[in-house]
Amino acid sequence: MELRHLRYFVAVAQALNFTRAAEKLHTSQPSLSSQIRDLENCVGVPLLVRDKRKVALTAAGECFLQDALAILEQAENAKLRARKIVQEDRQLTIGFVPSAEVNLLPKVLPMFRLRQPDTLIELVSLITTQQEEKIRRGELDVGLMRHPVYSPEIDYLELFDEPLVVVLPVDHPLAHEKEITAAQLDGVNFVSTDPVYSGSLAPIVKAWFAQENSQPNIVQVATNILVTMNLVGMGLGVTLIPGYMNNFNTGQVVFRPIAGNVPSIALLMAWKKGEMKPALRDFIAIVQERLASVTA
C-alpha cells in the first residue's frame, strides 16, 4: 500500500463516481479502477460497492476513509515540516543596536554573503532587552547587543569596547576644549539615557561620574541615543555616548574626547545555547575572523 492508493481511494470516496475522480486525479478510469482493486486486495476487504448506477462506501470503507484522510494529512504535514527546516537553515535573523549597524555589519555582511550566498538575511533593529527575549524564544538567531545578558539559555561573546565621548551643543562654553575632564562636567546640565532602552550605557555613565566625584545636573532622560544627541543639539545640556554617533552628527553638536579615565561600553554577540545551524556558525566565525584581522 502506497500513499497514491490512499489518494485515489479518497478521491473516489468523496466523489462517489469513478469518472469524476479520474478527471480530478488526471488519470484514466481503468487505471483508477485498477489502483482501487489493488488497495482492496491489500486491505483484504471490499471498501466500495459498485454497480452500474452508483458507487457507495462499505462500512469498512467508511472507517478506512477516515484513517486514509488522517494519514494523508500527516504525510503532508511531514513534508511541510521538512521543507520548513531547510528554509530555516537558509535564513539568518540578526538583531542589532545602532553601534553594530555602523561599526560591524557593513564589515561582516559582505563576507557572510560570499560564504552563504543562498542564505536569506533578515536584519532587525532592537534594543538589548528585546534581543535577549527573542533569542531565548528562538525568534532571533544572533543578537548584536549590550550588557547585561540575564538568561542562562544564552551564550555571548564580547566583541569590542567603545570609548564614550562628551557631546555638547556647538555654542556650549566647553565646546572649544580639545578634551574634557569629569570635573568640568560637575554641575553641568546633562541629558541621560533611559536604562530600560540603552542597556548598560546609563549605569556605566553613572558609575563613571561617581568614581570621578563629579555630579552633573540631569535635566532630561531620553529613550535612545539619537534622541539624546538631538536634545543636546537643542541646547538642553551635554551627554556621554559612544563616539560612533558622530556619524549621525547634523552639525548642531560637537564631540570631544574625555581626558583621563575614559569610560567605555562593550558590544556583544549573543546566541541561544545548543545546536547551531550552519548559517549561524558561519556568521559567528566571520565576526571573529574580522575582529582578529583588525587586532592582529
Curated annotation (Swiss-Prot):
Lineage: Bacteria, Pseudomonadati, Pseudomonadota, Gammaproteobacteria, Enterobacterales
Keywords tagged on the record: Activator, DNA-binding, Transcription, Transcription regulation
DNA-binding residue intervals: 18-38
Family, per entry: Belongs to the LysR transcriptional regulatory family.
InterPro entries in UniProt: LysR_subst-bd, Tscrpt_reg_HTH_LysR, WH-like_DNA-bd_sf, WH_DNA-bd_sf
GO biological process: negative regulation of DNA-templated transcription; positive regulation of DNA-templated transcription; regulation of DNA-templated transcription
Function noted in UniProt: Transcriptional activator of the hca operon for 3-phenylpropionic acid catabolism.
PROSITE patterns for the chain: HTH_LYSR (PS50931)
Protein name: Hca operon transcriptional activator HcaR
An example Gene Ontology molecular-function term: DNA-binding transcription factor activity
